[in-house]
Amino acid sequence: MAGHPKERVVTDEVHQNQILRELYLKELRTQKLHTQYHVNPLRKVHRITRKPMSWHDNLEEPADARFLNLIHHAAQGPTKKYPEAQTENQEIGWDSEALVDPERRDHRMNHFRVYSDITLYKAKMWSLGEDDRHK
């Protein structure tokens, strides 16, 4: 009620120390120390051009091996990056090597163009643009 004065709680230092200790341990459990930082891939990056006459911007920097490996890996084709197809479209043509070694001497499958004297003559006429009809 409004008319009654509140009872004053006697502060117990041991009890206060225990409460502070629990708060401190709770904060330590929820805190996380971030030591690795990276660029957010969902955020647009604004490029700032360097000053052309600045001496510290024109120093040669050593190549970062990890970055170069990432770039070279990204430039490879999917068959060199992955052991198997990653999508349905990649499955078509994933194994593009011939299953059977082609036998070039087998005339049942290989029909090579053979030239004789008359076919060479006619091919030369056609390449020069001459018409084979009589006038």
Curated annotation (Swiss-Prot):
<keyword id="KW-0206">Cytoskeleton</keyword>
<comment type="similarity">
    <text>Belongs to the CFAP144 family.</text>
</comment>
<keyword id="KW-0966">Cell projection</keyword>
<dbReference type="GO" id="GO:0005737">
    <property type="term" value="C:cytoplasm"/>
</dbReference>
<keyword id="KW-0963">Cytoplasm</keyword>
<protein>
    <recommendedName>
        <fullName>Protein CFAP144P1</fullName>
    </recommendedName>
</protein>
<dbReference type="Pfam" id="PF14886">
    <property type="entry name" value="FAM183"/>
</dbReference>
<dbReference type="InterPro" id="IPR029214">
    <property type="entry name" value="CFAP144"/>
</dbReference>
<dbReference type="GO" id="GO:0097546">
    <property type="term" value="C:ciliary base"/>
</dbReference>
<feature type="region of interest" description="Disordered">
    <location>
        <begin position="77"/>
        <end position="97"/>
    </location>
</feature>
<dbReference type="GO" id="GO:0005856">
    <property type="term" value="C:cytoskeleton"/>
</dbReference>
